[in-house]
Amino acid sequence: MERAGPSFGQQRQQQQPQQQKQQQRDQDSVEAWLDDHWDFTFSYFVRKATREMVNAWFAERVHTIPVCKEGIRGHTESCSCPLQQSPRADNSAPGTPTRKISASEFDRPLRPIVVKDSEGTVSFLSDSEKKEQMPLTPPRFDHDEGDQCSRLLELVKDISSHLDVTALCHKIFLHIHGLISADRYSLFLVCEDSSNDKFLISRLFDVAEGSTLEEVSNNCIRLEWNKGIVGHVAALGEPLNIKDAYEDPRFNAEVDQITGYKTQSILCMPIKNHREEVVGVAQAINKKSGNGGTFTEKDEKDFAAYLAFCGIVLHNAQLYETSLLENKRNQVLLDLASLIFEEQQSLEVILKKIAATIISFMQVQKCTIFIVDEDCSDSFSSVFHMECEELEKSSDTLTREHDANKINYMYAQYVKNTMEPLNIPDVSKDKRFPWTTENTGNVNQQCIRSLLCTPIKNGKKNKVIGVCQLVNKMEENTGKVKPFNRNDEQFLEAFVIFCGLGIQNTQMYEAVERAMAKQMVTLEVLSYHASAAEEETRELQSLAAAVVPSAQTLKITDFSFSDFELSDLETALCTIRMFTDLNLVQNFQMKHEVLCRWILSVKKNYRKNVAYHNWRHAFNTAQCMFAALKAGKIQNKLTDLEILALLIAALSHDLDHRGVNNSYIQRSEHPLAQLYCHSIMEHHHFDQCLMILNSPGNQILSGLSIEEYKTTLKIIKQAILATDLALYIKRRGEFFELIRKNQFNLEDPHQKELFLAMLMTACDLSAITKPWPIQQRIAELVATEFFDQGDRERKELNIEPTDLMNREKKNKIPSMQVGFIDAICLQLYEALTHVSEDCFPLLDGCRKNRQKWQALAEQQEKMLINGESGQAKRN
């Protein structure tokens, strides 16, 4: 029984796909003809286009730019420089700070840490005005025993609520007067000078019945330690009860001679703190009544009892004054720290602020800061000088020319060499510095009396970077010059720590600024030389303006494309056609001049002395990407930004390739190896890509919004890094597994990123898919580059290269190619074909070339066997 032929309906169904394919070929031919005959196309559009067609043309080319918070335009300057755009990686790993205050202590109602002064300036230093205190109750002078207890309680109450040493001691003396009835009372406090030598200063002098606090506290008398009655009591810590002062050899009658007062009997007692240290001396003079005008044992007991209260008062007051002083010091140091880290741009400005702070706080006449010359340690590179009269001025320059010669460098030089502070109470009496004799007798304002000089060290404490010199500490009330004391030394020692930090930070900032300025100049010069020549740009622009052949005419949509017959200028025209046909020029408002210059600049930055990884390889990678997008039907799976980034990445992925791989860069200890921990050359290629994109006249991304710009750069970087085969091998397993399980989804952002990386590798390796004659020729170029690297490894690194790089193993190329296809290529193109069946030509070409290389490998093996057997027969 004969089989019936196909019905008419079946024949019609079979003919329809053939007619559709023929119709598509006719349309492609017409479109290619129109692209090649632009004058006719333009004339036809002008004559035949309707309003609907024009509106549709506009609607097709409207590029919607999302509004972002940072702004739509004008980002090319702020984001143009990769150095400015890349955020700094935070590699710091701070340890757990030492707890210095418990969490519960923060809940205590303390004063605010940061306060505002009367002018509204934020400061750590609180207002110095004291809170108003309750006035002292006047003493009562009842003589009965019961009332003495009430007076003691009253005195204890005053001591617990007041910290004014002078007022409290004055009241204590008035209480004492009611018991021992002396004519005069005096209070002397123990002090120390800068040399830790003790002396006595009167806090109350000649307190008498009816005297006021102001009268007895104005006179200030200094007594030497262990001299006179008071000095002797202070030194020994034992009381003295003297009946006749003039009969005691320790008595100094000079005060009587000055005041005209006649001293007869003296009761002098030490005032001690809880550690039994003498902190003061109290003196009662001339017993008024009873016992022949001399002080009795009862007077001594009563005097000692009340002086115990004076000891408590002095101790509490000293603790309070010390805490206030430390608090003020810490606040000043905090203000200084804030000042230092607020200003780091100018060394002169920060030193002016430091000097002004020191002069204001320490009440000195002059402050000079010497900066050590880094190149010559025996001299100073700069000197900053300020005087107290300049505090109210707003001068920006500290050192004036007419003052420079009056600054004495000798003390600073001495301190720099010894690395120890120097405190001279009176320079005219110091025997260590003979040059100071020139100041003797000089009473003008330029005279140096007291001096404090401290080294400024760096953070490691082993190098002096400067010296701070203070001249003439002034009395706050009288303006007289006085010596610097130990407290001044300690404060300045803490002060210069912050000064050292400020100086170091500012010097580092200035050094970084200079380095950045040099880098900017270098980048400017590099950008100029990296950019294409203007004549070449104008030539390409004029050719592109006249006519750019269609993609079909140029055959750049074919996976079997070859560039061997094209000139460099023609490859640039092909690149323009790729950007045009992918609608990138229209969608992102690219200027033709800028696009032409960018393409030529990219071409220029590929090294011509590299056999394979040059401009032609980059162009072929971009052509394969274009063919995959167009003929492989991948374009409709991607966004416009992704297409733009992929094409830029394909053209730029091997910029400035040196003809060697990452392994050679690492083993040769090339400076590039110090910049990146992996994918060394790929990171360098991306940096070169950024440099060209941001060079003047090459900014093809200037039409993007800020968010689009950031997104595009991110995709470009990921795509270029994906061409590192080490990363490809690491990530391909996940991609292949998704394809195998039929779970691949381009809507997933991570899978989309993974697919773009695989697509970049497929295009980068596309030479393995070309027709056999093209594949053979490219393989020779690759082998030439690899063998050149092997020669360099032997010569420069003194190592034996691998077979892939070994010129002596050239006969193994076919077998190595087969191994490369099996290990790297085949599975990739199989997976890509699963994503888009129209990419099958890549897989087919790869399989055919494997067969060719396999045949050559077998032939090579037979020749090797035959050669060995023939050699054996001859032997």
UniProtKB/Swiss-Prot annotation:
Binding residues annotated for Zn(2+), in chain numbering: H617, H653, D654, D764
Active-site annotation: H613
Coiled-coil boundaries: none
Region (Disordered): 1-29, 78-102
Binding-site positions, Mg(2+): D654
Biased composition regions of type Polar residues, renumbered to the chain: 78-101
Function, as annotated: Plays a role in signal transduction by regulating the intracellular concentration of cyclic nucleotides. This phosphodiesterase catalyzes the specific hydrolysis of cGMP to 5'-GMP. Specifically regulates nitric-oxide-generated cGMP.
Protein name: cGMP-specific 3',5'-cyclic phosphodiesterase
Organism for this UniProt entry: Homo sapiens (Human)
